[in-house]
Amino acid sequence: MRLISINVSLPRAVSVHGKEIETGIFKIPVSGPVVVNKLNLQGDGQADLSVHGGPDKAVYLYPWENILHWKKVLQRDDLGPGSFGENLTVEGLAEKEVPIGDEFAIGTARFVVTQPRLPCFKLALALETPSITKTFLESGRTGFYLRVLHEGTLQARDPVYPLPSREPEKVTVAEFVELYRCKRATRDQIRRILSLAALPRSWKEWLTSNGRLQAEETGD
């Protein structure tokens, strides 16, 4: 596992259907050591802090293998590091293999996986593909957000070192996304999700309120 690219950008104004909005989704690869702060990377920023950024979404990671997938599916040779608005393009961290709560070190910084990325219209804007938000979520290739446990510095080509997880249960990012999509889960799945210390409280409340995540009668 290794860091392929570090991508940052500050918010800028763009026109969408005649309306001006600010977005930080247009990430650009940068070279040299980059400082990791509690809320973002040096040189990076988020526009709408009500849905982006904050400690639980400080850094967005996207697997390089996913970019190769979309290059083929969308027939887009122009896609590369940063195309999906990610801060870190990493090789070897697939959603099906990475549980929420996993911890790892890159450079001198340390991170924990908190939640998947749910796409919004800004992804469609960045890729100039209106249908991508639905396809992106259905694919399960969402990437995931990181909380910064220890600030530090990192740079492209740094290895990614897995660290012992402090979670007693394992729920992969892919499993979580599928439960979110289908809105049904076994009682055991619900129990495991609610036990995750790394998963933000807002997610737990959303998933279990108003019957959004219903328990299947399976005898669990």
Predicted features and spans:
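Loop/turn positions that initiate beta-strands
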Residues: G101, E151, Q155-D158
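A mid-sequence, solvent-exposed acidic-amphipathic segment
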Residues: P130-R147
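A short pocket-lining beta-strand/turn micro-motif at the edge of beta-sheets
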Residues: G32, T142-F144, A156-D158
